[in-house]
Amino acid sequence: MRKMLAAVSRVLSGASQKPASRVLVASRNFANDATFEIKKCDLHRLEEGPPVTTVLTREDGLKYYRMMQTVRRMELKADQLYKQKIIRGFCHLCDGQEACCVGLEAGINPTDHLITAYRAHGFTFTRGLSVREILAELTGRKGGCAKGKGGSTHMYAKNFYRGNGIVGAQVPLGAGIALACKYNGKDEVCLTLYGDGAADQGQIFEAYNMAALWKLPCIFICENNRYGMGTSVERAAASTDYYKRGDFIPGLRVDGMDILCVREATRFAAAYCRSGKGPILMELQTYRYHGHSMSDPGVSYRTREEIQEVRSKSDPIMLLKDRMVNSNLASVEELKEIDVEVRKEIEDAAQFATADPEPPLEELGYHIYSSDPPFEVRGANQWIKFKSVS
């Protein structure tokens, strides 16, 4: 009797509250899927665009939520490590733009290709690398995805051709990847990303021309986050309709803060390219919460109130969360459990990224040429011979 009373007392006092919460989540009957209305895309040289309604399954919703939370927390951890001077050099964060990288990946196949600019952490993750590999690369450790030598911009994954530090230079490369897809007869597309700040680069228009001329399966994607470094799009461009910039290339403007809009637009664009019609252009209207880079506080050319308004009204993670909870695809408690798991994953990765050793100096020349004999590289003080290994 005493044991029974003690057990009842523990339940009433809340000692079993956390396990009970898990039982509640596990036993609740959730919907398998739900249909949502999404914003209609603005179109250029297209008679029809992506659908204005879409179905989200519970499984996909939970996956998207976890991925976006992981990207958000990973970027916030990178911010912390940078301020602690553990991450050094250039570092461009993408928090606020999670619906872009996760939504684009949801609309293509793993065998498709992607190349982007220097704001690349989120795409590196969605292309399949772990948080541990990404943070270790940021801190310059051997366990990083590029052996600690690439840093923030130069990360690689399967069918991901890294970021590019030269503004707009990745766009002709993306057209070249699309050319390889067509030349080799593969049913694949290349997503070629650039920002609104790069949209005025001449090489981009040259890539447009060749892609259209050769009908390459290339999706040109402008991530319009409203500011090129510290310059607003209105001050930098005579026309801010970036989806029309291709002129002879069809385009669509997409709500880049809504992962479902991004997913459906990407599926539409990929199907267009796979059909042999040639390239298509997408403009994702999005927003970055951080400044241009870690050296930019981000409040000298925009107000804190503007940033807060976007956070409160258009945050991509909150938008997905509200949809899932209100349509019985998930519960608040279940999503909180995901948040806890993501935070733990990030902390574990950060510990690895700070404890893993840096690559030794003698490995500086590794992974440059695959089969050439050893060569000499001039060091700071003397000539040092490095091995050339794959």
Swiss-Prot record:
Pyruvate dehydrogenase activity is inhibited by phosphorylation of PDHA1; it is reactivated by dephosphorylation. The modification N6-acetyllysine is found at residues 63, 244, 313, 321, 336. It comes from Macaca fascicularis. NCBIfam families: PDH_E1_alph_y (TIGR03182). Heterotetramer of two PDHA1 and two PDHB subunits. The heterotetramer interacts with DLAT, and is part of the multimeric pyruvate dehydrogenase complex that contains multiple copies of pyruvate dehydrogenase (E1), dihydrolipoamide acetyltransferase (DLAT, E2) and lipoamide dehydrogenase (DLD, E3). These subunits are bound to an inner core composed of about 48 DLAT and 12 PDHX molecules. Residues 1-29 form a transit peptide. Transmembrane segments: none annotated. Its EC number is 1.2.4.1. Its cofactor is thiamine diphosphate; Mg(2+). One of its GO terms (biological process) is tricarboxylic acid cycle. This is Pyruvate dehydrogenase E1 component subunit alpha, somatic form, mitochondrial. InterPro entries: DH_E1 (IPR001017), PDH_E1_Alpha_Subunit (IPR050642), Pyrv_DH_E1_asu_subgrp-y (IPR017597), THDP-binding (IPR029061). Thiamine diphosphate binds at residues 118-119, 165, 167, 196-198, 225, 292. GO terms for molecular function: metal ion binding; pyruvate dehydrogenase (acetyl-transferring) activity. The modification Phosphoserine is found at residues 232, 293, 295, 300.
